[in-house]
Amino acid sequence: MIALVLALTGAGVENLAAASMTALKAVDSLVVKGRAPKTGYARSEFGRAWLDVDHNGCDTRNDILRRDMVGITFKAGSATCLVAFGKLIDPYSGATMSFVRGVKTSALVQIDHVVALSNAWQTGAFKLSAEKRIAMANDPLNLLAVNGSLNEQKSDGDAATWLPPLKSYRCSYVARQVAVKKKYGLWVTPAEKAAIVKILTTCPKQTLPV
């Protein structure tokens, strides 16, 4: 999946170079301006939810569940695709929780767009091609398996309005937001940049994830 997304965005070499850049330096390379109107935003602007963009037979949600959890078992008859059970150490709270596939239980573990799609839309994604928006919505760089209630609490918030309760994860979290915004040419608002810089000054050697 990662190779395909890099190909779609033309970002391979640039992203590898960015990996050696500190997040604090990288945030200064982002354009700073106010949010654009939400006019025209719909989830469908980023493609149907959880496509199989790498054509491995599994949708993006299951790819990320498989990446982020341990002790995984799969639904009978789905080979190694549909995750039926797994254990997640939630990055946002530090708590260990179980994922059990089912109508009433699947949503307890959700896949968070670290840069929320509506936030992305209002900070430049409305200018991107449909292909790049689909790539962003399915990019492992922008996706984490997390506690569902915290994902819902975050909603479409940026770093100025929401941060993970687990303070030790905040540097990694905002660095990932910076990496996504840099990769897709998105901007940050003044309040968002101030919040990110405040966090990153506590961890000045934090690098960008790729």
Language-model features: locations:
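N-terminal export and membrane-targeting signals
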Residues: M1-A3
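N-terminal module-boundary/linker segments of secreted carbohydrate-active enzymes
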Residues: V5-A7, V13-C58, P190-A194, T201-V210
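Compositionally biased, low-complexity repeat tracts
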Residues: L6-L8, L30, L82, D90, ...
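Short, flexible coil/linker segments at or flanking structured domains
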Residues: N15-A18, S29, G34, Y41, ...
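Compositionally biased, low-hydrophobicity segments enriched in charged and small polar residues
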Residues: S20-A23, A84-F85, L143
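A near-ubiquitous, low-amplitude feature marking generic local secondary-structure context
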Residues: L24, G40, G47, G71, ...
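Secreted/periplasmic proteins that engage bacterial cell-wall peptidoglycan
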Residues: P37-V109, V114-V115
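Domain-level detector of nuclease and nuclease-like folds
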Residues: V83, Y92-V210
